[in-house]
């Protein structure tokens, strides 16, 4: 058994692990990365964010071709199978792996491919694919192993028609009808993707409102859009059992209803990847979902062991995970890069997409904050008309008296890009965070960004 000594060992090469390893390496520390795959990138690159967004992009292109009358001069609407569309994602994955492999090589981070587990508080044993065991001894260890779909024990995921958000990428056919159980972010995104391929979707939600953490007007807009695009949303429903049959799946609900479809996609929660880490050897406890608890410095109850990314729970976003990993390493190397990551924009890649940052109307009303609303509807925006993307809106919430921007909510074309302008203004100190910025700034025309000017004027016109 070979023994290697490091300043920092990072478990997991997803966004959190990458952020941690790069920050520690650039601070001059000797760093090792351990990943259970034979390629870097983590679930984000191989099973989550990258393939699903590449898949979504291809589906949007198909939808544009099939719905734009101009293309009828070229030919009739085309039908594409799910496996055909998935090929585009495979190309992106290989490019991402190559880029990230280069990052580690340039920064002299040693990468070990194998299953890593704690022998003690300063030692990680890595069992490589060929059976060889490597021992890594480190002053500090960062757990960034990510998460996987939560699988209830009473559902047979070995059935060929029952999938989770990882295995759905191996779907070898295009179902005529699909049940998506769980209407969280992942469930809504996949419902949009399959709807765009012409699949009838039954989206089962155990709550009374889609994505209830969003501003209610944005949530309602998404629900309305779904109802117009082959997606039936069933609220306040819980599964009783899932029955796999020869030609499909039957979902039995506790309400007594039954739904039959060609396949079922389970999207109801995620579990931290901690079960194989040997946590009992270091005294770090995990909750019922396999997640570890950390303090504001991303330190666990063991002083030299840290956690970042999906394995610690909220907000379970790739963007936040990278910053959490970077901040965890910042706590170790003390190079001024630490910050507690809490000002995270939400990006939801439905079709159309959704993004938001800051407070929503419900929260401001409950807190008795005197706010006003400014709106810009995309159907009136020149750039949206040119792009053939009239659905959606930008909504700015601001303080009636100080004009401080309190929240930005967007639904529609390029929403995940548009939100960052509002984010930048909201991060400014004192009087620099003001709605007046948007009316005193010249925006390129035509752009989606000028929706801020339109929304700001709309909001100011509501004041008296």
Curated annotation (Swiss-Prot):
It comes from Pseudomonas fluorescens (strain ATCC BAA-477 / NRRL B-23932 / Pf-5). It comes from the Bacteria. The lineage of its organism: Bacteria, Pseudomonadati, Pseudomonadota, Gammaproteobacteria, Pseudomonadales. This is Soluble pyridine nucleotide transhydrogenase. Belongs to the class-I pyridine nucleotide-disulfide oxidoreductase family. It is found in: Cytoplasm. It catalyses: NAD(+) + NADPH = NADH + NADP(+). GO terms for molecular function: dihydrolipoyl dehydrogenase (NADH) activity; flavin adenine dinucleotide binding; NAD(P)+ transhydrogenase (Si-specific) activity. Binds 1 FAD per subunit. PANTHER family: DISULFIDE OXIDOREDUCTASE, SOLUBLE PYRIDINE NUCLEOTIDE TRANSHYDROGENASE. GO terms for biological process: 2-oxoglutarate metabolic process; NADP metabolic process. InterPro entries: Class-I_Pyr_Nuc-Dis_Oxidored, FAD/NAD-bd_sf, FAD/NAD-binding_dom, FAD/NAD-linked_Rdtase_dimer_sf, Pyr_nuc-diS_OxRdtase, Pyr_nucl-diS_OxRdtase_dimer, STH_gammaproteobact. The gene is sthA. FAD binds at residues 35-44. Conversion of NADPH, generated by peripheral catabolic pathways, to NADH, which can enter the respiratory chain for energy generation. Keywords: Cytoplasm, FAD, Flavoprotein, NAD, NADP, Oxidoreductase. Its cofactor is FAD. It is an enzyme of class 1 (oxidoreductase). Its EC number is 1.6.1.1.
């Amino acid at each position: 058994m070979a023994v290697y000594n490091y300043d920092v060992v990072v478990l997991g090469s997803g966004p959190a692990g990458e952020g941690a390893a790069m920050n520690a390496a650039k601070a001059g520390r000797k760093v090792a990365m351990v990943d259970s795959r034979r390629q870097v990138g983590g679930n984000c690159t191989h099973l989550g964010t990258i393939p699903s967004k590449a898949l979504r992009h291809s589906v949007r292109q198909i939808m544009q071709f099939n719905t734009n009358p101009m293309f009828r001069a070229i030919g009739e609407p085309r039908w594409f199978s799910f496996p055909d569309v998935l090929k585009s994602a495979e190309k992106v994955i290989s490019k991402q792996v190559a880029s990230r492999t280069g990052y580690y090589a340039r920064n002299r981070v040693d990468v070990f491919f194998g299953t890593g587990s704690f022998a003690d508080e300063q030692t990680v044993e890595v069992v490589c694919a060929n059976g060889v065991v490597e021992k890594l001894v480190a002053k500090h260890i960062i757990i960034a192993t990510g998460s996987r779909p939560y699988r209830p024990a009473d559902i047979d995921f070995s059935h060929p028609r029952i999938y989770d958000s990882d295995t759905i990428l191996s779907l070898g056919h295009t179902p005529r009808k699909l049940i998506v159980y769980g209407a969280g972010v992942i469930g809504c995104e996949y419902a949009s993707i399959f709807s765009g391929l012409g699949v009838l979707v039954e989206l089962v939600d155990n709550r009374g409102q889609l994505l209830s953490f969003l501003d209610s007007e944005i949530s309602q807009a998404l629900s309305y859009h779904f109802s117009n695009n082959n997606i039936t949303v069933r609220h306040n429903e819980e599964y009783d059992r899932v029955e796999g049959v020869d030609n499909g799946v039957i979902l039995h609900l506790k309400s007594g209803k039954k739904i039959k479809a060609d396949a079922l996609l389970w999207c109801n929660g995620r579990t931290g990847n901690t079960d194989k880490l040997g946590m009992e050897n270091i005294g770090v406890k995990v909750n019922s979902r396999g997640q570890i608890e950390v303090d504001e410095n991303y330190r666990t109850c063991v002083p030299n062991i840290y956690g970042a990314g999906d394995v610690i729970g909220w907000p379970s976003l790739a963007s936040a995970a990278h910053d959490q990993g970077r901040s965890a390493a910042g706590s170790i190397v003390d190079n001024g890069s630490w910050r507690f990551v809490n000002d995270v924009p939400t990006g939801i890649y439905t079709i159309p997409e959704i993004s938001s940052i800051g407070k929503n109307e419900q929260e401001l009303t409950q807190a008795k904050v005197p706010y006003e609303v400014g709106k810009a509807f995309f159907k009136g925006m020149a750039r949206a008309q040119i792009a053939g993307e009239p659905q959606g809106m930008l909504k700015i919430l601001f303080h009636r008296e100080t004009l401080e921007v309190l929240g930005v909510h967007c639904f529609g074309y390029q929403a995940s890009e548009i939100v960052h302008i509002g984010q930048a203004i909201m991060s400014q100190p004192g009087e620099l965070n003001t709605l007046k910025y948007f009316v005193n700034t010249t925006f390129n025309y035509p752009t989606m960004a000028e929706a801020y000017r339109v929304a700001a004027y709309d909001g100011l016109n509501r004041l008296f």
